[in-house]
Amino acid sequence: MNICVVGTGYVGLVTGAVFADLGNDVVCVDNDRAKIEALKAGRMPIYEPGLEEMVARNVGDRRLSFTTDLGTGIRHGDVIFIAVGTPPKDSGETDLSHVEAVAAEIGRCMDRYKVVVNKSTVPVGTGELVREVIGRHQPRPVEFDVVSNPEFLREGSAIEDTLRPDRIVIGAPTQQVAMTLVELYAPIERPMIITDLPSAEVIKYASNAFLAAKISFINAIANICEAAGADVTQVMKGMGLDPRIGGAFLQAGLGYGGSCFPKDVDSLIHTAGRLGYDFKLLRSIVEINRERAAHLVEIVAKALGPLDDKTVAVLGLAFKPNTDDMREAKSVEVVQLLHAAGATIRAYDPAAMDNAKRLLPAGVTFSDSPYEAAEGAHAAVLVTEWNEFKYLNLERLRGLLKRPVIFDGRNLWEPERMRRLGFAYYSVGRKPVLPA
């Protein structure tokens, strides 16, 4: 099948590469000329395990190509995926200007019947907006259909999530139109939900909002555990074994970040308000999430005392492991708060330091290893739970720190082990461990 994918971010590039790998002829389009030239040269604009090899393989087999010419891509594709950014406005409303611009160009360039697929995360009603914009910009009437096919990939495992998703959601005006997507996805052999277009749009937002709710809920429980002397990890296990609840996303820590959850929750709150419903539950979820970084820094300040003469090693900057994405990363707020309190910051991340340099305060030192960051520091603060940190030589780390103090924002290590190693160890929703 001939496919055009508009947008080469995480969603668009992975979608295009996977469909090419399944044997389709894919053209990926982006208006960022530097990004397209880099892709043509085999350089990935994002960090995603396995993506570079998949792109190279399919470019070499002439199933995948890249261009800045949107018209060329539109004319090529029987199916056109819109996978452009949908950033939030200050109000929380989703900015659909990129989606509308692509829809207008599709209308102008459409030369035969097309299926236009919204892959971007968009509010309910966007499919109808896209249909109206395309129709309005057609120089002559050409039939087309608009479908919603939301993505559920996770950065760091995007290829696996695209090839083996939990479910494939197809929102289409008719069963006949849906069958085009069913045929395209047939090699993947995963459960498919075929529904109407508005329902598919709501499924995406409702899914992300519910996962955000689980994260904020267990973080609120962690606050209770800290005050009561309970262990949130045991509470999580006891809850997660209930099949009605499940353990996924029931992980206390610094809260959610990234390119999806924060903006999707805000967008759903805004959409609900536009439709006449005050989504108070989601407002509470957002408020709990906003408190997490400040809560950790308060614990740091209470344990270390005044921070204006302290050096702190910050381990992990990306919003989660296995990505270089700094969007809504909790590290930004943690570092800003520590810096504002006078602390000297040394930071390390396996993949995200180049992106972090544009966001963190001037004066932050970026280290080449966690050990370099820790040398002579008064404490280490773990923000992102990379596997590299899980397997650190903690004896070496203790010897490098001026004081053996660790603040673990992700509950990466076991308190009893840290006690045996002689650390003062502060984690989330658990009693502090203090050396004898």
Question: Which residues does each predicted region cover?
Answer:
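Structural/interface elements that position substrates and couple domains in central-metabolism enzymes
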Residues: 1-436
